[in-house]
Amino acid sequence: MNHSVIIPPLKRIAVMGTCVPRQCGIATFTNDLQQALKNSDPDLCSTTIALTDDANTYAYPPDVALEIQQATPASYAVAADFLNVSNVDLVSIQHEFGIFGGEAGEYILVLLRGLNAPIVTTPHTVLATPNAAQRRVMDGIIEHSSRLVVMADKGRRILQDVYDVPTEHIAVIPHGVPDRAFIDPAMAKHKLGLADRTLLMTFGLLGPGKGIETAIRAVPALVRDHPNLPYMIVGATHPNPIRDEGERYRDSLVALADELGVSENIRFVHRYLPLAALLAPAAACHLHRHSAVPGT
């Protein structure tokens, strides 16, 4: 880990990650982080470096200074050179294995090795049992980062116990929530046609590894005691499985609900909901099942 770098007073920050309007949880996080930085210090110059999947083009906001074509190794070297000549004081990287190119997202190492500025990395997935490629990439990220930021104490423990990261090089900053006006839960449930029912909900982009199948398999036991229990699964399928196999994953979830005889209790909302549209169903639910990888 890069222990020797002293981070100077910050005047110029670059934030790297996927970026809206790309439909990705990291993109939303990057957007929220940028907004928080701007609100914290009007004099701070904060720009975004956006990771773009090669199959799509996006109408990015003006603060996106550069795009990295995530499947092109040379694009990462270009980004490092761009940031070096931009004289940024800090690079904040949002890391998820799947948004960087190469095996286990190894192209990020091209960027890290070329950067001059201090690096603060937020790993959005902290794997307790990485495979060899994931371990190699994570070790490289740790080596080049001045600080690692995780959103849960479990992530800190994994970094310490599995990756031998010293405590003083880890910051735990809990994930924020939107500051919004109060929405009456009873009214929200009424609008969804679920008045007087206890609502279980999962939202976010769907894909293997988030345990949705496990939740669906639990529904038969739940409805024995709560026959009118609705389980709402909100979100479009993640673009990566869509690219590789179309809607096979979502179809498998629907088939599983049919097989278990609980299709009447499970409601799929098959679209990506922006924050404003998500607030009402979130207010209506009694129990939210979080679907992120443990340790994030």
Mark where each language-model region is.
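Conserved donor-binding/catalytic core segment of Leloir-type glycosyltransferases
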Residues: 15, 194-210, 216-219, 232
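A conserved, positively charged/aromatic
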Residues: 113, 127-146
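Carbohydrate-associated surface elements
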Residues: 154, 176, 237
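N-terminal strand-loop element at the rim of the active site
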Residues: 21-23, 34-87, 237-239
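A short helix/loop element that forms part of the nucleotide-sugar donor recognition site in Leloir-type
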Residues: 182-194, 199
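Nucleotide-activated donor-binding/catalytic signature segment of Leloir-type glycosyltransferases, i.e.
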Residues: 235, 244-272, 276
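Short N-terminal targeting/anchoring amphipathic segment
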Residues: 66-68, 80-105, 118-122
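Acidic donor-binding loop of glycosyltransferase active sites
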Residues: 146, 265, 280-296
